[in-house]
């Protein structure tokens, strides 16, 4: 199946096929996502424009399971801060706690959800 996407479209739509999903998102500062851990899904962040910080760690505590294998609202412990800008790509493996921060300007990002199975 063929489908064309443009990040210049006013309304970006997600694409989902089976367990594979592409999300097109725009955020304006200040923005702080909820912390999350995907037990069976890898994330790939592709920054189209703007800049952001991503907190990452294999170490976290607490949180709530919002659906099977998906944790939200955890406390990220011993995290590393990754600075991202236009053109950067970040692969976040399953079981890694993460949080996205936009501190100034705006961010347009493509997030690809890649199942482990």
Where is each model-derived feature located?
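Short histidine
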Residues: 31, 37, 67-68, 98
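Short hydrophobic/aromatic-rich beta-strand segments that constitute the beta-sheet cores
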Residues: 24, 54-56, 109-111
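A short local loop/turn or secondary-structure capping micro-motif enriched for an aromatic residue
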Residues: 32, 62-65, 117
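Short acidic-glycine-tyrosine-enriched beta hairpin
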Residues: 59-94
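A short, N-terminal "cap"/entry segment at the start of jelly-roll beta-barrel domains
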Residues: 1-40
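Ligand-binding loop in jelly-roll beta-barrel domains
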Residues: 83-88, 94-117
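Short, conserved beta-strand element in jelly-roll/cupin
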Residues: 39, 43-54, 58-59, 66-75
């Amino acid at each position: 199946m063929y489908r064309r996407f443009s990040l210049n479209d006013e309304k970006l739509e997600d694409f989902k096929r089976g367990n594979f999903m592409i999300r097109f998102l725009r955020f304006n500062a200040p923005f702080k996502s909820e912390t999350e851990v995907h037990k069976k899904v890898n994330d790939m962040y592709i920054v189209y424009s703007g800049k952001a910080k991503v907190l990452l760690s294999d170490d976290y505590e607490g949180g709530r399971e919002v659906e099977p294998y998906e944790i939200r609202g955890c406390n990220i412990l011993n995290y590393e801060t990754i600075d991202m800008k236009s053109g950067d790509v970040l692969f976040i493996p399953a079981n890694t706690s993460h949080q996205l921060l936009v501190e100034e300007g705006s961010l347009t990002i493509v997030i690809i959800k890649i199942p482990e199975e």
